[in-house]
């Protein structure tokens, strides 16, 4: 769980920014949103397949883009 120690003389904005950065790095908000509603195993697998396809297409696009520059 992210947490920060507020230093003496720290402004609220500075402390809040450091806390927000930690939560973003630890994916706390993303995980909470994902767990908000129950997701069955089939739905999880379906999302994983879709994201895998997107990743492959993205890599293929980048590869073709790189090859066209040569």
Swiss-Prot record:
GO cellular component: ribonucleoprotein complex; ribosome
GO MF annotation terms: structural constituent of ribosome
Keywords, comma-separated and alphabetical: Ribonucleoprotein, Ribosomal protein
GO biological process, one term: translation
Superkingdom, natural source: Bacteria
Database matches in InterPro entries: Ribosomal_bS21 (IPR001911), Ribosomal_bS21_CS (IPR018278), Ribosomal_bS21_sf (IPR038380)
Pfam families referenced in this protein's UniProt entry, alphabetically: Ribosomal_S21 (PF01165)
Family: Belongs to the bacterial ribosomal protein bS21 family.
Protein name: Small ribosomal subunit protein bS21
Source taxonomy: Bacteria, Pseudomonadati, Campylobacterota, Epsilonproteobacteria, Campylobacterales
Gene: rpsU
């Amino acid at each position: 769980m992210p947490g920060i120690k507020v230093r003496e003389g720290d402004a609220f904005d500075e402390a809040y920014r450091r806390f927000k950065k930690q939560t973003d790095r630890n994916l706390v908000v993303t995980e909470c949103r994902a767990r908000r509603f129950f997701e069955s195993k089939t739905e999880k697998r379906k999302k994983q397949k879709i994201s895998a396809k997107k990743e492959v297409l993205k890599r293929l696009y980048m590869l073709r883009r790189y090859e066209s520059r040569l």
